[in-house]
């Protein structure tokens, strides 16, 4: 009898906030749904449309909003990890071309253990209905 396929989380509702041409950092938002029986650790973000990507957390420190690089984030078993404005988000750096509203961009999350989860993110001015806002 064969081994059961590994459980893989799903990346959905992905979007990137549109920005003026020449902008060097764009924010990406999505929901990582983890239907697995164990938590998963998100280690990195990559996209062929950007030179590099990072995971950032926004925190209020002494009344000031600050972003910091997060080396790893956890999506709980049977739960989700939300990347949303004002909170944890994907910082996509140095676009390889100017992106305009309506463009679709592949984005990939790298999980601990080597699993990769990917989706197309739409470039938008505002969050789509029922998305990571």
How would you label these PLM feature ranges?
Residues 1-133:
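Compact, glycine-rich, soluble single-domain proteins
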